[in-house]
């Protein structure tokens, strides 16, 4: 009788994150719970907790949100998958992915160092080690004393979108590993949908042992070298990622995972390694706007907008992103007006969003001039290069088994696009007012109280960190440093703001990015920075429209500051949620939760108001 051990240690991961967010609500939490279950007993109720989301709760739609993040997979199927991998163990010769039972196996990565020397390897235990924003991560311990990582996506997007993202992410990791020789986990197998032994989409990769680079990240440190010690290895990785010039805009896939029309062209030129020639192709883009919040669009509709695009059409990406957002908003509005949608929609808000994206549709092709003589090395900046959106010390592990070298994780949403349209990594990007010298840039700084000083110090350190990133880029790719120009950042901001779209009020930020171009438009045209010869601003805003927009934006920002957990869309870390509920600070009403403001503001015993 086969029995497998399932160990859930989600609380340990959650505890460390809560510590970062709020020491006041830190909880020690229980010890990891070990559960033994028969492999054949798929309905064993003891398994349920192992699959359920436990990292946090939502103030609204809590049950619905948690259900989307349930990652029930076949434990019996996992044992079958491992058995199939053993049969494909190789000498490392690079071959095309092997399709078997709905999974794709990368046999060149099934080696003694990843799976062990035993010929009869079995699963010893499975542990839940992380519940992330988009995925649940399990660690599989094998009888050979090797460990693997099983990453399962939450069902937050359409099945087609999840499938494309998995196919593209694995191909991207394979490219970074084999072509660029970069430190990334080796993928052993992947399943893009539920028609595999696990009955769940998955990526199975090697386990990297070590601490996150984030443990060394001190963004407000006075010691610049301490900050550089984290930024520099990420900048090194980034410079190699952008080193290849591709033939199209889109995303990377294995040859077998794209439609026949996308298999006609090489992903890039000059490949001399026969085993890599034709291994990867460029297919539809998996950038966020083509999948996030697009569940109500058909796969056919999405496919009309998500590329790939020709290398000589660098601005088509902006147009396509705009068009799919418009398609989605108009579809939501039509469903709401026909009373056919499952969600209660704010029709007036949808109409306002549509207006903003109609403005962006006009502006998109005019934002940047690919042939500008005022943009240094414009031709290089508009060439197709790989963009990894989640370069971050949270996604880098210091590998204790390989000379403490950083290994990079999480290549979801990676895409090939013009370098000029790439954002800086979020951990160094700063969009606020720049402060380069506290004493000279801030009048009266020396006489300020500590609280006021801290506000300016925050701005100073954020400015410094972004400057370090730009200096690193300049030293490695001086030909691309024009992206650091404040004018380039402003001109591309309407598009990059769409990439950060989180909820239905964020259209206000997109509109604000368009509005701010108005003041400088004539100068941008005169200097050939934008792709227009008409000095007249393309959008005619009435004073009434701008006043209403400013008022709405100010109100939205005030709501974010004053509304508890607005910045996390109502998500609360579970330890904090449990304690707030116990203390009566959170109260339940009809299955929803709200903050009892009067209790929060009430002074504790011994305090005065």
From Swiss-Prot:
The family database entries (Gene3D superfamilies) matched by this protein are listed as: Phosphorylase Kinase, domain 1
Give the residue range annotated as the organelle targeting sequence. Answer: 1-24
Q: Does the keyword section mention Mitochondrion?
A: yes
Any Pfam family matching the protein: APH
Q: Note the PANTHER family from the entry.
A: ALTERED INHERITANCE OF MITOCHONDRIA PROTEIN 9, MITOCHONDRIAL
Family affiliation = Belongs to the AIM9 family.
This chain belongs to the protein called Altered inheritance of mitochondria protein 9, mitochondrial
- Provenance organism: Meyerozyma guilliermondii (strain ATCC 6260 / CBS 566 / DSM 6381 / JCM 1539 / NBRC 10279 / NRRL Y-324)
This protein's gene is called AIM9
């Amino acid at each position: 009788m086969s029995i497998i051990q399932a160990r859930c240690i989600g609380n340990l991961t959650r505890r460390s994150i809560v510590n970062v967010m709020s020491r006041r609500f830190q909880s020690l939490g229980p010890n990891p719970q070990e559960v033994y279950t028969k492999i054949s007993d798929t309905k064993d109720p003891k398994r349920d907790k192992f699959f359920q989301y436990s990292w946090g709760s939502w103030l609204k739609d809590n049950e619905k949100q948690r259900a989307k993040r349930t990652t029930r997979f076949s434990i019996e199927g996992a044992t079958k998958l491992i058995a199939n991998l053993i049969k494909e163990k190789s000498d490392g010769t690079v071959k095309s992915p092997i399709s078997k039972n709905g999974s794709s196996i990368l046999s060149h990565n099934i080696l003694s160092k990843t799976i062990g020397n035993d010929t009869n390897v079995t699963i010893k235990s499975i542990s839940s080690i992380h519940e992330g924003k988009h995925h649940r991560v399990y660690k599989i311990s094998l009888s050979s004393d090797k460990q693997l990582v099983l990453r399962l996506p939450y069902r937050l997007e359409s099945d087609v979108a999840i499938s494309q993202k998995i196919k593209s992410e694995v191909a991207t990791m394979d490219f970074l590993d084999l072509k660029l020789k970069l430190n990334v986990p080796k993928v052993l197998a992947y399943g893009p949908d539920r028609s595999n032994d696990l009955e769940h989409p998955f990526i199975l990769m090697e386990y990297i042992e070590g601490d996150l680079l984030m443990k060394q990240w001190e963004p407000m440190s006075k010691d610049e070298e301490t900050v550089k010690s984290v930024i520099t290895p990420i900048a090194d990785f980034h410079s190699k990622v952008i080193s290849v010039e591709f033939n199209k805009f889109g995303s990377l896939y294995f040859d077998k995972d794209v439609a026949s029309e996308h298999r006609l062209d090489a992903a890039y030129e000059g490949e001399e390694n026969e085993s890599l020639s034709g291994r990867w192709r460029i297919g539809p883009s998996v950038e966020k706007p083509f999948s996030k919040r697009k569940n109500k669009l058909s796969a056919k509709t999405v496919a009309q907008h998500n590329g790939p695009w020709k290398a000589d059409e660098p601005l088509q990406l902006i147009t396509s992103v705009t068009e799919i957002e418009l398609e989605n908003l108009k579809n939501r509005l039509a469903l709401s007006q026909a009373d056919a949608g499952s969600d209660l929609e704010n029709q007036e808000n949808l109409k306002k969003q549509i207006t903003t994206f109609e403005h962006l549709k006009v502006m998109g092709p005019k934002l940047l001039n690919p042939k500008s003589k005022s943009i240094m090395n414009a031709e290089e900046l508009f060439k197709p290069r790989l963009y990894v959106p989640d370069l971050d010390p949270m996604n880098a592990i210091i590998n204790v088994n390989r000379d403490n070298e950083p290994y990079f994780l999480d290549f979801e949403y990676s895409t090939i696009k013009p370098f000029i349209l790439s954002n800086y990594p979020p951990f160094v990007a700063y969009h606020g007012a720049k402060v380069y010298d506290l004493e000279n840039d801030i009048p009266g700084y020396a006489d300020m109280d500590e609280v006021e000083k801290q506000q300016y110090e925050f701005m100073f350190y954020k400015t410094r960190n972004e400057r370090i990133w730009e200096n690193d880029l300049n030293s490695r790719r001086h030909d691309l440093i024009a992206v650091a120009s404040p004018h380039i950042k402003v001109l591309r901001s309407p598009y990059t703001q769409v990439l950060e779209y989180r909820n239905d009020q964020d259209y206000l930020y997109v509109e604000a990015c368009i509005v701010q171009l108005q003041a400088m438009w004539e100068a941008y045209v005169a200097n050939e920075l934008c792709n227009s010869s008409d000095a007249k601003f393309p959008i005619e805003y009435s004073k009434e429209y701008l006043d209403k927009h400013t008022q709405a934006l100010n109100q939205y920002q005030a709501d974010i500051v004053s509304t508890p957990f607005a910045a996390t869309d109502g998500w609360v870390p579970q330890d904090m949620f449990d304690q707030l509920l116990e203390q009566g600070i959170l109260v339940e009403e009809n299955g929803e939760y709200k903050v009892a403001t009067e209790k929060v503001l009430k002074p504790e015993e011994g305090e005065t108001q």
